Every structure is written in C-alpha cells, then in structure tokens.
From Swiss-Prot:
This is L-lactate dehydrogenase 1. The modification Phosphotyrosine is found at residue 223. It comes from Staphylococcus aureus (strain MRSA252). SUPFAM superfamilies: LDH C-terminal domain-like, NAD(P)-binding Rossmann-fold domains. Catalyzes the conversion of lactate to pyruvate (Potential). Appears to be the primary factor that allows S.aureus growth during nitrosative stress in both aerobically and anaerobically cultured cells. The lineage of its organism: Bacteria, Bacillati, Bacillota, Bacilli, Bacillales. One of its GO terms (biological process) is lactate metabolic process. InterPro entries: L-lactate/malate_DH (IPR001557), L-lactate_DH (IPR011304), L-lactate_DH_AS (IPR018177), Lactate/malate_DH_C (IPR022383), Lactate/malate_DH_N (IPR001236), Lactate_DH/Glyco_Ohase_4_C (IPR015955), NAD(P)-bd_dom_sf (IPR036291). It comes from the Bacteria. The keyword Oxidoreductase applies. It is an enzyme of class 1 (oxidoreductase). Pfam families: Ldh_1_C, Ldh_1_N. Homotetramer.
Length: 317
C-alpha cells in the first residue's frame, strides 16, 4: 500500500533544481503523482521518460507525466522552480524584477485552474517571490511557503558537524533572515549533541575564529558554487523534498522556511526565513526563538532589506 497515495505535486520549472527535485520525489516515493510543466516541452518529455524508467526501483509506484496548468486544479502541492537563474556576480535580490514578472504570469495560470492546495516557492529571491505568490494567489498565508533558509541551515549544520566531528543530525543550529547576504546565524541557541555551542567554545577558545569563519562559508557558499559550476541545485532540491515530505506525512516538523510574519520577531508583512512547524496544512505556526539583542538587530536589518526592495517593485504595488 502506498502511504503517500493521493498526494499530487505539480512542478513548474524543469531546470536543474526542478529536475533534481523531481528525481528526489521519485527516488524517495514521497508522492503518488508528479506532473511536470516547463516551456521546454521536449526536455520535459525526455525527463518524464527518464524518471519513469527509474520508478521500478523506487520504494513504491509513482506516476510521472508531462502536464499543463489545468493539471493544478486537483494538486495538493504546486512547487515553483521556474524563473531567471542567478548569474556569477549577481545577488539574489538582483533577480527581483525579472522573476516578479514571470511569477505574476505563473501564479495567475495556476489559480485559473481552481487550484486550492499549497504553494512551495524555490525561485530566488525566494523571500520576495514567496510574498508575491501569496499576494498574487490570494491564498491564506499558511498555504504559501518559501524554501527560505532551509539550505543555509543545512550548510551551517554540516560545517559545524565537521568542525566538531559529529553527524550533521546531531547539530541543532539555524540560519534565519533573508536567504541571501543579510542572513544571520542564531549562535545563542546553537548546540552540538545537546551541548551549547557557547559552552564548547569556552573549552576551546581557539575555535571561536573557526566558528565565525563557518558562518562566512555558509553565507557565501552559493557564490562559490556558482563560480565553480554555474549554479547550485542538489542541496536546495533535497531541501524542497524534505519540506514536501513534512507536508505529506503531516509531520509537524520544524524547518527553517520563508513564512509571513505578523508580529513574530517584531516584524510585519514580510516573508523571511524562520523556523516554522510544517504539516499537511502548510505552515501551522512560526516558531519564535528568543534572540539576543545583536541577533534581533541583525534580523531587523535583514527584514528591512527585503521590505525596501519590495517597496520599489512595481509588480507588488
């Protein structure tokens, strides 16, 4: 029996991130049905065939097909990976104008199908595009999720795990804020296998400089990867698959995603990366970590950066 029976995902955007996300869904049998939409119909046709050939080896049967926007009408989840890609030397915020125009069209097409599920947004700048998707769709805020800092937090945990020689799953540490240059680590609540990071650093003060460098590596990882191979895709695709799994399994899992704030962290009317409880209904609630003064100030700066960009966007006025 397929424990994910009835779970349908429509993927819009079959580039590197989208196609690897699609493979992750099939490989892990997270969905019952996967529909792929992209302007490049021939690539979709090829990927659908390739993915179908993988399904005999997936844990359960997954139906995969090429589709169109009308297929969204009974989808449980629409995942948007479409949009202009980030180029070397270009910040995520540089992509705003180009991708807002693309999203206005995409979300309009999806909603015209009578879609009544959850949106998951991965395209950059993800915080602004998640906000735009919420505005353009008219759906409740709980049903529009951005991938946020889920990848940044994974990078952060990985680097900390390597520094302390433990498994990444034994590290509890979050990156919050904009998925971009103004993001910040929540040092005050980071722990390694239950031991506060602050305590561990008191035992090895020479490690403080190394830890600070870990955040710089986390923040700048995308630029390094883009410079080396043109784009990042494996990590974010796995992050999207993890969010999808949390939704369909009704996990009440806490993940760092882009969510709308309505007073949490002293911020309003902005989608930004924060820990949130994810289940079958989307975002159950935002988890408000008590930040110290420095962290709160940096978070406010991150939120202001996003708000300032949105204030200039004609598509959001």
């Amino acid at each position: 029996m397929n424990k994910f029976k009835g779970n349908k995902v429509v993927l819009i955007g079959n580039g590197a991130v989208g196609s690897i996300y699609a493979f992750s869904l099939v490989n892990q049998s997270i969905v019952d049905e996967l529909v792929i939409i992209d302007l490049d119909a021939e690539k979709v046709r090829g990927d659908v065939m390739d993915l179908k050939h993988a399904t005999p080896y997936s844990p359960t049967t997954v139906r995969v097909k090429a589709g169109e926007y009308s297929d969204c009408h009974d989808a449980d989840l629409v995942v948007i990976c479409a949009g202009a890609a980030q180029k070397p030397g270009e910040t995520r915020l540089d992509l705003v104008s180009k991708n807002l125009k693309i999203f206005k069209s995409i979300v309009g097409e999806v909603m015209a199908s009578k879609f009544d599920g959850i949106f998951l947004v991965a395209t950059n700048p993800v915080d602004i595009l998640a906000y735009a998707t919420w505005k353009f769709s008219g759906l409740p805020k709980e049903r529009v999720i951005g991938s946020g800092t889920i990848l940044d937090s994974a990078r952060f945990r990985l680097l900390l795990s390597e520094a302390f020689d433990v498994a990444p799953r034994s590290v509890d540490a979050q990156i919050i804020g904009e998925h971009g240059d103004t993001e910040l680590p929540v040092w005050s609540h980071a722990n390694i296998a239950g031991q506060p990071l602050k305590t561990l650093l008191e035992q090895r003060p020479e490690g403080k400089a190394q830890i600070e460098q870990i955040f710089v590596q986390t923040r700048d990882a995308a630029y390094d990867i883009i410079q080396a191979k043109g784009a990042t895709y494996y990590g974010v695709a796995m992050g999207l698959a993890r969010i999808t799994e949390a939704i369909f399994r009704n996990e009440d899992a806490v993940l760092t995603v882009s969510a709308l704030l309505e007073g949490e962290y002293d911020e309003e009317d902005v989608y930004i990366g924060v820990p949130a409880v994810i289940n079958r209904n989307g975002i159950r609630n935002v988890v408000e970590i008590p930040l110290n003064d420095e962290e709160q100030s940096k978070f406010a700066h991150s939120a202001k950066t996003l708000k300032d960009i949105m204030a200039e966007a004609e598509e959001l006025k």
